[in-house]
Regions:
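Alpha-crystallin/small heat shock protein
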Residues: 1-127
Length: 127
């Protein structure tokens, strides 16, 4: 391999690294919908094990953290899939005070679905 071939390989490798870093920043794709008393949050996280995903709600901020290990025996030619997801999302709802826990969370086929109870306020009795 000559100098031009080596330089081309290094440039493509650097582009791949920057692309992966970009995807780690913008991913994962997220959908949210209001369903009665719950906010349903759907997050695409293929390639991550359920045990490696950490979720936390603090106020109306949902934090998603995931990390996966990859073992490669050969030479990496192209590498774009993210190893790490560290995302904070502002939820469009008020979460019930003291119930910052997710109502339910399911992870199946690389898709994480959260059901988060919403706050309705308190009825006021008139005397």
């Amino acid at each position: 391999m000559g100098l031009v071939g080596y330089m081309t390989k290094e440039v493509l490798k650097e582009i791949g690294n920057k692309t992966r870093e970009f995807y780690e920043f913008v991913l994962p794709p997220i959908d949210m919908l209001q369903d009665g008393d719950n906010l349903i949050v759907t997050i695409d996280m293929p390639g991550f094990d359920k045990k490696d995903i950490k979720l936390r709600i603090n106020g109306n901020i949902l934090s998603i953290n995931a990390k996966r290990e990859t073992d490669h025996d050969g030479t990496i030619i192209w590498h774009q899939r993210p190893h790490v997801i560290d995302k904070k999302i502002r939820l469009p709802i008020d979460v019930k005070e003291g119930e910052e826990a997710v109502g339910s969370a399911k992870y199946l086929h690389g898709v994480l679905i959260l059901k988060i109870p919403t706050k309705h306020g308190k009825d006021i009795a008139i005397e």
